[in-house]
């Protein structure tokens, strides 16, 4: 019973951490990263399709992305989707290659991004703590029903606390790494 609870808890905390990391990877840093364009949906023939399914995206250098379109006919649709995105990018195309220059981040924009990153990190920490509280509550309920002993309850709480500490540390490490990326000029 204890290992089942711990495995389930670890799985839930891992999902929270992965979700946080995927959200943060979308935030633009000073360097070109293909994941910046992950959220872009391309409208063509009445359907909305993720850009990644229609093109290959690579970082040419620290300030340019190259989008190689699989089907030449989609180039104007993809270019329009990138222009209309909230990222404020201005692509230029030639045949089936779209170059996306990334303008340097201003100091104010960097500070804004750090605030966003920190709030996302705090939300992830709260989610992990809520999972801990939920598991501790379930553990207390099963103790009241006499399904587990007090020692087992204590062991569950200790192990869940260790998991909580580990995942919060992981979130903090990722936060620190991302803050450094954003502040690097």
UniProtKB/Swiss-Prot annotation:
Q: Name one Pfam family in it.
A: RRF
Primary location: cytoplasm
Q: Does the keyword Cell cycle apply?
A: no
Task: Set out the biological process GO terms recorded for this chain's protein.
Answer: cytoplasmic translational termination
- Gene Ontology CC terms: cytosol
Q: Which CDD domains match?
A: RRF
Q: Which UniProt keywords apply?
A: Cytoplasm, Protein biosynthesis
Could you tell me which InterPro entries the record lists for this protein?
A: Ribosome_recyc_fac (IPR002661), Ribosome_recyc_fac_dom (IPR023584), RRF_sf (IPR036191)
Which Gene Ontology molecular-function terms are recorded? ribosomal large subunit binding
Query: Where does the record say this protein resides?
Result: Cytoplasm
The family classification in the record reads: Belongs to the RRF family.
HAMAP family per the UniProt record, alphabetical: RRF (MF_00040)
State the function annotated in the UniProt record. Responsible for the release of ribosomes from messenger RNA at the termination of protein biosynthesis. May increase the efficiency of translation by recycling ribosomes from one round of translation to another.
Q: Which NCBIfam families match?
A: frr
What protein am I looking at?
A: Ribosome-recycling factor
Which organism does this record belong to? Hamiltonella defensa subsp. Acyrthosiphon pisum (strain 5AT)
* Gene that specifies this protein: frr
């Amino acid at each position: 019973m204890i290992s089942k609870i711990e495995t389930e808890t670890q799985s839930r905390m891992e999902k929270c951490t992965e979700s946080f990391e995927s959200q943060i990877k979308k935030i633009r840093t000073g360097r070109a990263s293909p994941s910046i364009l992950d959220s872009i949906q391309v409208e063509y023939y009445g359907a909305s399709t993720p850009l990644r399914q229609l093109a290959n995206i690579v970082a040419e250098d620290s300030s340019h992305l190259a989008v190689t379109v699989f089907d030449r006919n989609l180039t104007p649709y993809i270019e329009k989707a990138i222009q209309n995105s909230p990222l404020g990018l201005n692509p230029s195309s030639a045949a089936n290659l779209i170059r996306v220059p990334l303008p340097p981040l201003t100091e104010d924009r960097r500070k804004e991004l750090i605030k966003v990153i920190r709030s996302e990190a705090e939300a992830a920490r709260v989610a992990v703590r809520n999972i801990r509280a939920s598991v501790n509550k379930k553990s207390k309920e099963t103790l009241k029903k006499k399904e587990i002993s007090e020692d087992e309850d204590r062991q569950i709480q200790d192990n869940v606390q260790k998991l909580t500490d580990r995942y919060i540390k992981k979130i903090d490490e990722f936060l620190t790494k991302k803050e450094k990326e954003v502040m690097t000029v």
